[in-house]
């Protein structure tokens, strides 16, 4: 017969407030509360300090994310732009995402000024809070050892260490989901409606940060409550319905606002062809990722995924590793005019490759806003059940896969006869459901444009691994067949770590040998303990600790590599350690590559070149009563002026270049009414090659401008060569009487 394994989550009563108080306790925050081991609070504080160091180490050179940084700048200088989440200071168009994640960044920039560090600061704070809250959640579920272990594992997940150090939406999403899990667990333990409703609120706020990705945790939270909440079924269902309504209301608040407010009083919704927030959220950023078109949504491009394998505009497929095609005239993309391709020569040289005469340092480093590593060519190749186990994602998130999955399978099997209200089973359902649902959805997606998406897998992986280590260690000491689970898990981790390390054999090559040696020693000691029935001896205990440490040493080293800017990822995409985009041996591009020319790290992209300053001074001095100082035929051409001045520059075409804003009629009305005088045509259209033609609304506007407006010679504003704008940018002056 197998021995009975003790519940790793004993139901210790909550100490009373009077019992937990100590003289001067408020001033001794480093001391553990009553009922916890003396080492618990110091260990937690040490973990939080490590997290803060990892996340904030490169904060001054963290860089900006193209396109989305324009929205942050605009929202920091205009209250209307902040309310609606506009991409430009004039609040004419939104980004192609719900702007909830940009609000903390914009408020920070408004308070401290617009710098790379001020935009990144909210993510650093969110990351440290995630560590503290995850510790609390797992401690309630599986005890203090598991709580500290989960916090440490989460801190040292490579993609997490990079993500919270940059201004990415995924940081806000992960923060909201961890807070939702905390509230859901409290509801699961005491069946209080308030806690469950708060969980729904946090998921709704997560929806504001990253839309439908936040809803992927709902099945896990709801199932865990149904399985383990200690109340009758009718009440459980009622609580879930109430919390679901609240979650839906918070989630759709921005969509409802944009639907109710008249179109003339709010920005146009990017990502849609009919100014529909619903189409942008549920089509462009939702079903389009699975190849399902929603009427009114723009077909997915680099931002939404390249599931269809075509270049915007229906031309040939993307070239691997970058956009290919000609440079972007009139823009200041780094290197040769295209986004750097995950470690290309131009990127490594600080973005100073040949091409546009005004090519300039590019803070942030490693890819464009549409895809890591330079473009959709670098994205995964479509739906695949092996996607999360391959070289792009697994080294960033998947080091703990074997241990976490074994914990889920064995834990559910061992607790299958537990009654309703079982805390252990409830936690397994919550975290296991989260892991499985998110993993399945990611595998089924047509493409995943950013590695940072994987960060939502980090909390369940850390929680399951930490709780599993405690559960399996107790099973090992108790004896019986279940006692073999721990050595099997450690052995599986050793094999898996060796496999993942093989993707990058030149990166810290000694690590895989250290991992193998530690895990082998641990497994040998555990087998010896089983054979001799001395599972509690010091030798066996040391072997267990060595095996567990060996299983996590490699991801810890990868995460620590973010202290070197060359391995810290970028504001475009998260990723610690060597890049997975360069054939398995590529070295990551420095996140502060742009600092090599003319300015300090991440702030470099907020400064206009000398030629851009001359052009801006020219149009500003002649703006008169016009509302817009300048219009451009793409966000890329508008971006330098928005970031540097915060002035009312009108970008046309949206992120993809195919959004019909403004329409030709609206554009001519702006000129006719004297609200727009100058237009800069770059010919590129949006941020993509192939958008510079005459098709579409922006193409027709471009044709009209060339036919009805006067080209301004560059010498008139002090620039003697059109190379200042990539050889293709032309400034036009439009007179109202000619509109």
Residue ranges and their predicted role:
Residues 1-298, 303-485, 492-496, 561, ...:
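Membrane-integral, polyisoprenol-dependent glycosyltransferases
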Residues 123, 175, 215, 280, ...:
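Structural recognition of the beta-strand scaffold that forms the well-ordered cores
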Residues 265, 273, 661-671:
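Alpha-helical scaffolding within the catalytic cores
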Residues 280-284, 307, 316, 326, ...:
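Membrane-interface segments at or immediately adjacent to transmembrane helices
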Residues 479-582, 600-606:
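Transmembrane helical bundles and short interhelical boundary loops of multi-pass, membrane-embedded
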Residues 558, 643-654:
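Short helix-loop-beta junction
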Residues 566, 613-625, 635-643, 647-648, ...:
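Aromatic/acidic, Gly/Pro-rich catalytic loop(s) in extracytoplasmic/lumenal soluble domains
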